[in-house]
């Protein structure tokens, strides 16, 4: 195995929605194991926001169980971002995670500056990256 230190940065919401849109099932453990065959994974950062329990208790419970499961993965860090209510043009209400890409980019730059890793892997479905 190569001694290069790898940090993985995951844009949770965008990844989730794109995997769902294309009906792709994956486990984070499998992704990490694949990278670990050639590199040392030192940290995994997952950027998301907690769903509003009062809006949809079922989705909230599913999301919470998912977060509880992935935070048991060694060196896995959940970074909580802001959830904002958005009024759509038709008057309906939706919710959007705000600031996740800013948190991710800031952590990426800070970690590179502090020499915390040699390689950064960004996992996202966001066109911003």
Feature annotation, model-predicted:
Residues 72-129:
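Nuclease catalytic cores that cleave nucleic-acid phosphodiester bonds
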Residues 1-96:
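Domain-level signal for Mg2+-assisted phosphodiester chemistry and nucleotide/NA-binding surfaces
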